[in-house]
């Protein structure tokens, strides 16, 4: 299991609930791999379950 979840777009991968996933592009773990979500982040709200707040969110960049 890759802690960064760097699998191909549309691919599948295993992601633990504590996964930090900075490159969550695969469909099987996309919704559980967003580790941060600042207020007003539209992209996070559309496809990621937020696990904390941060000013720097990889899925919002």
From Swiss-Prot:
What does the entry list as the binding residues for a divalent metal cation 3? 15, 19, 24, 29
Classification via InterPro entries? Metalthion_dom_sf, Metalthion_dom_sf_vert, Metalthion_vert, Metalthion_vert_metal_BS
Binding positions for a divalent metal cation 5? 34, 36-37, 50
Q: Recorded GO terms, molecular function?
A: metal ion binding; zinc ion binding
Q: Where is this region: Beta?
A: 1-29
What is recorded about the domains? Class I metallothioneins contain 2 metal-binding domains: four divalent ions are chelated within cluster A of the alpha domain and are coordinated via cysteinyl thiolate bridges to 11 cysteine ligands. Cluster B, the corresponding region within the beta domain, can ligate three divalent ions to 9 cysteines.
Residues bound to a divalent metal cation 1: 5, 7, 21, 24
How it assembles, according to the record, is: Monomer.
Query: Could you name the Gene Ontology cellular component terms for this entry?
Result: cytoplasm; nucleus
| GO BP annotations listed | cellular response to cadmium ion; cellular response to copper ion; cellular response to zinc ion; detoxification of copper ion; intracellular zinc ion homeostasis; negative regulation of growth
Q: Where does a divalent metal cation 7 bind?
A: 50, 57, 59-60
Q: Where does a divalent metal cation 6 bind?
A: 37, 41, 44, 60
Q: Which residues bind a divalent metal cation 4?
A: 33-34, 44, 48
Q: Which residues carry this modification: N-acetylmethionine?
A: 1
The text of the family note is:
Belongs to the metallothionein superfamily. Type 1 family.
Briefly state the protein's biological role.
Answer: Metallothioneins have a high content of cysteine residues that bind various heavy metals; these proteins are transcriptionally regulated by both heavy metals and glucocorticoids.
Name the encoding gene, please: MT1E
Q: Which residues does the annotated region (Alpha) include?
A: 30-61
Q: PANTHER family from the xrefs?
A: METALLOTHIONEIN, METALLOTHIONEIN-1G
Q: Which UniProt keywords apply?
A: Acetylation, Metal-binding, Metal-thiolate cluster
Organism from which the protein derives? Sus scrofa
Protein name per the record: Metallothionein-1E
Which residues of this UniProt protein bind a divalent metal cation 2? 7, 13, 15, 26
Q: Which Gene3D superfamilies match?
A: Metallothionein Isoform II (4.10.10.10)
